[in-house]
């Protein structure tokens, strides 16, 4: 990822006097005083030279109870004009920070998550409620003094004890005490706080277990007749504390957990994480591994988009399309299983390369697949693109503007559908993306129809990339390394007997362009360690979903299905 140059950052230091510039592992950050935070961010956003007008992420670092101030705010911004990023930090004195929502609307959910996980209050936030947990939950679990196993403060007798009166205390590791659980009253309080002021008497609950949401998402619609006047979303039903886990297992152990975020595109989740770890280590991945990873990532993108298209069409009544896309998707799943050994949670990428070389015949199977796939995509478009029903449900429906992209930090097909050619593969050129040729499809209006067309063209571009990867890999020897280093016997013994690799002190941010948008990992280490001091996961699905609450306003409730499908979130990644 291109980052602001040290020279330009030093100019900020000279201009304002107070910024402290520091270089991380391939990134650059600027620390400013809390009372100058908004002034400095406003300058970065509006100054013609810098124009950091796209919000990327906001998070918190807990430096531990002994530090004062203990918490530090971290903001990541992107300049579309200069194609570069910057990290801006400030200390959360008295455990408060000023809200960024007057500068970027996308900060609303990020600030709610920071309050939920760390207990940091944002002064001026319109409705600072919890983001992932229920409203009456008494703790802030990403604080360093909160144990990984939680705090057992709730008595929860077993069904055997409740129904039969059996005393199981001391048997089968049975423990009556459990971590906090929400009651129906807790959920009712949570629901009411999400929408404190209603404009009508009708509030429709959609989800969290509705087939149209494709996951545990709970929508609240304030309706005037069938038109939406106000909307909020309750997420977190699939929250598993993945960031907390990332700070409590070693670097290599965390890779399988990334599979379980966006489980539809597990390979792409692996990709973003290993890129961040490699950036921290400063290692160069072998050429063969770069091309394998690029090819597998694009196979995964097509696989994900086929699932999206089939379920999207099914939701709008086109059952046949669902059957067609799953026919092709099954072929891709078989290829992925043959290469990685798994169909769903892949765990194939490694820090420094891939787990294993391509098996015999893998390139032939992929080549056979992509030979037929362009015609299949053409067939899908013949059925849908000019279909009158499809046009009426998608054309001019739920428009997302270019300004929305910058305000909310929208990425992936959602951003590109609104005419913004934001693609991390082009900006960062990670792995083999700097050596392959492909185009970035963009929309014109930003409506649901444009987002559909962008994803259809993305599948064609992925095929182009895979063809180039196959041609390159065919020229490579079977003996070419697919991992950055083949350990000798002594090093292998150290790896087995030891506790894993150590990553150095410092900070970094790396991301990949996934089917759901930009998945980024911000890693901060106070010292060399086996585990991350802070591991932040920037979910593209999380930020993209936030714009739903704006784009649905004024639309009939039936358009909620269309909008949600063209945003295409996966709950495992939004909730983490």
Swiss-Prot record:
Please list where the region (NADH dehydrogenase I subunit D) is annotated. Answer: 200-576
Q: How does it sit in the membrane?
A: Peripheral membrane protein
Supply the EC number(s): 7.1.1.-
Q: Which GO terms describe its cellular component?
A: NADH dehydrogenase complex; plasma membrane
Residue ranges of the region described as NADH dehydrogenase I subunit C: 1-176
| Domain of life of the organism encoding this protein | Bacteria
Where is this protein chiefly located?
membrane
Pfam families (alphabetical): Complex1_30kDa, Complex1_49kDa
Which compartments is it annotated to reside in? Cell inner membrane
Q: Does the keyword NAD apply?
A: yes
Q: Does the keyword NAD apply?
A: yes
Name the catalysed reactions. Answer: a quinone + NADH + 5 H(+)(in) = a quinol + NAD(+) + 4 H(+)(out)
Question: Which GO MF terms does the UniProt record name?
Answer: NAD binding; NADH dehydrogenase (ubiquinone) activity; NADH:ubiquinone reductase (non-electrogenic) activity; quinone binding
Q: Please give the NCBIfam families that the UniProt record associates with this protein.
A: PRK06075.1
Family, similarity comment: In the N-terminal section; belongs to the complex I 30 kDa subunit family.
Q: How does it assemble?
A: NDH-1 is composed of 13 different subunits. Subunits NuoB, CD, E, F, and G constitute the peripheral sector of the complex.
Q: What does this protein do?
A: NDH-1 shuttles electrons from NADH, via FMN and iron-sulfur (Fe-S) centers, to quinones in the respiratory chain. The immediate electron acceptor for the enzyme in this species is believed to be ubiquinone. Couples the redox reaction to proton translocation (for every two electrons transferred, four hydrogen ions are translocated across the cytoplasmic membrane), and thus conserves the redox energy in a proton gradient.
Q: Which HAMAP family match?
A: NDH1_NuoCD_2, NDH1_NuoD
Indicate what this protein is called per its UniProt record: NADH-quinone oxidoreductase subunit C/D
Encoded by which gene? nuoC
């Amino acid at each position: 990822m291109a980052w602001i140059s040290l020279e330009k950052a030093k100019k900020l230091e000279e201009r304002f006097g107070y910024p402290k510039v520091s270089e991380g592992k391939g990134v650059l950050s600027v620390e400013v005083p809390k009372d100058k935070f908004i002034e400095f961010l406003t300058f970065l956003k509006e100054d013609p030279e810098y124009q950091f007008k796209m919000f990327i992420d906001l998070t918190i670092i807990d430096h531990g109870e002994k530090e004062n101030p203990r918490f530090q705010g971290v903001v990541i911004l992107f300049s579309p004009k200069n194609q570069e990023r910057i990290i801006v930090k400030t200390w959360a004195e008295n455990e408060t920070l000023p809200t960024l929502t007057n500068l970027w609307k996308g900060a609303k959910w990020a600030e709610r998550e920071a309050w939920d996980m760390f207990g940091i209050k944002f002064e001026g936030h319109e409705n600072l409620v919890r983001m992932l947990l229920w409203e009456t939950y008494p703790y802030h679990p990403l604080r360093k003094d909160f144990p990984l196993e939680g705090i057992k403060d709730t008595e929860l007798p077993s069904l055997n004890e409740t129904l039969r009166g059996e005393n199981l205390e001391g048997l089968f590791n049975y423990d009556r005490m459990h971590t906090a659980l929400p009651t129906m009253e807790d959920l009712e309080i949570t629901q009411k706080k999400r929408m404190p002021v209603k404009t009508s008497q009708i509030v429709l609950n959609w989800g969290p277990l509705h087939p149209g949401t494709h996951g545990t998402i709970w929508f609240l619609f304030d309706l005037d007749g069938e038109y939406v006047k106000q909307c909020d979303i309750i997420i977190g039903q699939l929250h598993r504390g993945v960031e907390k886990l990332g700070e409590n297992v070693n670097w290599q152990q965390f890779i399988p957990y990334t599979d379980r975020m966006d489980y539809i595109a597990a390979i792409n989740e692996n990709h973003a994480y290993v890129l961040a770890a490699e950036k921290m280590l400063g290692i160069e991945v072998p050429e063969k591994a770069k091309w394998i990873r690029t090819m597998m990532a694009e196979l995964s993108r097509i696989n994900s988009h086929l699932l999206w298209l089939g379920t999207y069409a099914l939701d709008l009544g086109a059952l046949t399309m669902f059957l067609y896309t799953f026919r092709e998707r099954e072929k891709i799943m078989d290829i992925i299983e043959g290469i990685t050994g798994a169909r769903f949670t892949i765990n194939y990428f490694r820090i420094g390369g891939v787990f294993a070389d391509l098996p015999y015949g893998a390139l032939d199977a992929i080549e056979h697949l992509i030979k037929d796939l362009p015609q299949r995509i053409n067939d899908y478009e013949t059925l849908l693109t000019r279909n009158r029903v499809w046009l009426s449900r998608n054309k001019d429906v739920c428009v997302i503007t270019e300004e929305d992209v910058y305000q909310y930090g929208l990425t992936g097909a959602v951003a590109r559908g609104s005419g913004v050619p934001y693609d991390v593969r082009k900006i960062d050129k990670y792995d083999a993306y700097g050596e392959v040729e492909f185009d970035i499809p963009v929309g014109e209006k930003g409506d649901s129809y444009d987002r559909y067309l962008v994803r259809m063209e993305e599948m064609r571009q992925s095929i182009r990339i895979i063809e180039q990867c196959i041609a390159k890999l065919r020229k490579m020897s079977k003996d070419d390394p697919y991992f950055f280093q083949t350990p000798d016997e002594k090093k292998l013994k150290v790896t087995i007997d030891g506790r894993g690799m150590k990553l150095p002190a410092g900070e970094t941010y790396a991301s990949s362009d996934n089917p759901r948008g930009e998945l980024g990992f911000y890693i901060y280490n106070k010292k060399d360690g086996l585990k991350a001091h802070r591991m932040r996961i920037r979910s593209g699905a999380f930020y993209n979903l936030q714009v739903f609450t704006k784009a649905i306003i004024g639309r009939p409730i039936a358009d909620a299905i269309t909008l949600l499908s063209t945003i295409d979130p996966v709950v495992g990644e939004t909730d983490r």
